[in-house]
Amino acid sequence: MDTLNLYDILENIGKKLYQNDNTAWLELQEVLPQLNTFISEAVQISEGMKRTVLSVFPQLLEAIENTDQLLTADTVYYEICDIIAVYEKMSNNRQITLHEKANLDTSNIDTNKIFENNMKCLKEQPNDYYKKLEVYCRQFDLSDEEIAVDEYGNIAILKEDRWWRVNSFYNSKYAAEFASEEIKKQNYISCLYVFGMGNFDTLRTLAKIVPSDTIVFIYEPNPKIFAVNSYYHDWSDVVSKKNVLLFVEGLNEQELIRCTFDRMENVAFLHSYVYIQPEYGRIYAAEISEKIVECKKMIRNAVYTDNTIDK
């Protein structure tokens, strides 16, 4: 079989999953028979290869069954593509460059320093509705059983009796670059709604590539994800930006609608863009859908008000 072609297909599917492109799911279903054929050949190479394949492939099927986007993306782009690369080297002496993983040597995270820097950032913001965010973070218990974070800052949330990743566990910064590609294609975005903060890598990338006058609304449906990020990821460079506004469910989410009305203009209505972080559309679909409907309604009201001539 053409394993190089299979590699290219799976690599592209992995990228699409990181980009939140739902066409990847159909493409993955279509390539599964070809992948099955490859597996039947790969397990015969060596006992080590057999153990790896029999560990990874069931993980992929379980991820697909649960529509677990980031686990599927990590499994396809890193684990299965790596298996194919090793197979090619062993069987055909052809070299395929392995996908770069994050440098795990930099796992010494000073959570106290990061946390205080983030809290300092919140205090310096002129918006009063950030005060609740600081209070919540200072009272948050990092041993909470519904959220997990490892020594590298990878975050997973417990929902529907299973753990869901909110960022790539192999190279979240690299995955964030994939996620930003669609944003880069837009001629201009005056207002960007980002639903879900993940581990802030994607947010940091998006905040860098949009014009400085673009209003960025960030909505996080789970306050525990925000709290954990406050200890493990320095997000002060993002939140301190003049046109970046942060809203967290249960803390200051009601301000999202008000700020939408206050800051929206006709140009923002015409050039607004919604980005939903991978996985969030699956595990927080109801919360995000509700906020999108509310924001759309407020945008229409803002446009109507802006175009109304007082008699």
Language-model regions: role of each:
Residues L10, F57-P58:
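Residue-level signal for cytosolic alpha-helical hairpin/rod architecture
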Residues V43-Q44, P58, E62-D68:
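Long, low-complexity or tandemly repetitive, helically biased scaffold regions used
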Residues Q19-T23, I64-T72:
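Short helix-adjacent coil turns
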Residues M1-F38:
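Short terminal alpha-helical segments
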Residues Q19-N20, L26, P33, S40, ...:
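N-terminal donor/sugar-recognition subdomains of glycan-related enzymes
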Residues L26-E30, T72-Y78:
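Short, charged, amphipathic alpha-helical segments
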Residues T3, E47-K50:
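Alpha-solenoid helical-repeat scaffolds
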